[in-house]
Design a protein with these regions (language model features):
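His/acidic metal-ligating clusters that form di-metal
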Residues: 32, 71-86, 168-173, 178-180, ...
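Active-site neighborhood of phospho(di)ester-bond hydrolases with catalytic His/Asp-centered motifs
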Residues: 41-43, 85-92, 117-123, 190-191, ...
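Short catalytic/ligand-binding loop motif for oxyanion handling, primarily in non-cytosolic enzymes
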Residues: 49, 95-97, 127-131, 224-226
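Structured segments of extracytoplasmic/periplasmic soluble domains
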Residues: 42-48, 71-81, 96, 108-115, ...
Length: 226
């Protein structure tokens, strides 16, 4: 019987605590905390931008760029219905770092501009292309050169409220963004493919400066084979 009364007392105390906690927040804050939201993710769109090696064409799939446009258009058109707070692209944006491929990617991603905030990270297909006699017609990621910054320039994204900063003040490769959703603060750290130690040091500092944020690390590949 004593156990029953103790449990009853604890339950009553907890219910009063819950009411007291809720009173500390406004109705608007409580509503936001209970609200669901969506984080949209785009992975590996390289075959939608396959103009240099034309592997998709060789394998019988043809020009697939319309899929890229349809995907970002769908995200834009469903932003309100799904409360899409942010979109991340996980890299391998293009097939072989060709300017015409980046032009396709730019057109597709620009559909989101002014509707859904987004950020991107680089994959191995997005950098360091070099022609070769292999079965694909070229090697990728032989170095870190990329056309990404021409088509997704830092100065454009620095104008958005979600933009936080970059590792290199002149480049957009390694960046951080932030957004609020469901009463929570989020920090996205976008890292290059197989990030260098100095980039990781920078990322750690960014995270340390935002102790109240939930952190999302966005990268196409974190570890090197060796």
């Amino acid at each position: 019987m004593k156990i029953f009364f103790v449990l009853l007392f604890l339950l009553a105390s907890l219910s009063q605590l819950a009411v007291a906690v809720e009173k500390e927040f406004s109705e608007e804050q409580i509503s936001k905390k209970r609200q669901s939201f969506t984080l949209a993710v785009l992975p590996d769109t390289q075959f939608y931008c396959d103009t240099r090696l034309k592997l998709s064409e060789k394998w019988g799939n043809g020009d697939l760029r319309h899929h890229f446009f349809e995907q970002t258009r769908w995200v834009r058109d469903n932003q309100k219905r799904l409360n899409i707070a942010f979109l991340v692209h996980e890299g391998d944006i293009v097939q072989a770092d060709a300017p015409e491929e980046w032009a396709i990617a730019k057109e597709a991603m620009s559909i989101l501009d002014g509707h859904v905030p987004y950020c991107l990270c680089l994959g191995n297909h997005d950098m360091g292309f070099q022609k070769s006699n292999n079965k694909y017609g070229g090697d990728i990621a032989v170095n870190r050169t990329t056309h990404f910054n021409k088509y997704f320039p830092r100065e454009k994204y620095a104008q958005t409220k979600e933009f936080g900063g970059t590792f290199d003040p002149k480049r957009h490769d390694n960046s951080w963004y932030h957004f609020d959703a469901a009463g929570m603060k989020f920090l996205i750290v976008s890292l290059e493919c197989k990030p260098r130690d100095e980039v990781l040091d920078w990322a750690n500092k960014v995270v340390a400066e935002h102790p109240e944020h939930r952190v999302i690390v966005l990268t196409h590949a974190y570890m090197r084979a060796n």
